[in-house]
Amino acid sequence: MNENKPKTNHRLKLGLISLISMALAFVLYPTYSAYKTAQNEYNEMLRLQEEAYNQIVEDEYITLDGLPTIHVIPGNSLKIGDVQKYMDLFVRTQPDVILSNCRMIHICEPKNFMDIAIADGVDVTAGGQGTAYAYASSDDFSITLQIDVDEDYGQKSAVSHELSHIFDFACGSGYGDYGISDGAQLQSLYKNYTDCVGAYGATDSAEFFAQAGAMYVNDPENLKSVCMDLYNFMDSLYHLY
């Protein structure tokens, strides 16, 4: 037997579904629109940040709060973001007891560092123990650094080492003179524990002191383990722990 079933309920359901869909679209559209607006604004912010990061430093001298004057050695093309990142990671993290004696930070690209160091009369072989990464000058109480933020091969420790040289200079009787590393107490420690801070530190008493300073700042427990007398000596000067 054939029955003609009413189609009213089916049509009603379709109508309700359509109305619900339209209502949802009406309700959700502002939310989606706000999301897209926020996403676009965020992407624009990232673009501007990247653009600012990649801008090349145009000034030869830079002033950053809490740091010595920064000198961009002429002939070097450095990104503003790289300089700020390097300073935040490896220089601002230095204790004030050694950073405060530094009067100038010269910076350059890694590819130019060797030529600059050689022109300044630096032994770029690091006393035959490797390759120089940075150096300090008693002429103007400055340090020279190569700005490399892509790799971490001990830059913070290297900066501590050079700042320890500056600390040593500051305790001398005048420009060009070492102070602490020429003193009787450090000379005795160097004589008795020459190799305790590594081969480079063994080259002379000035490097011995600078290596001990870097180790005291960055790896105090290791310095304690290799030479407690040297740790106590550095602690009497830097007073960090």
Predicted regions mapped to residue ranges:
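Active-site-flanking segments in enzyme catalytic domains
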Residues: 68-80, 99-241
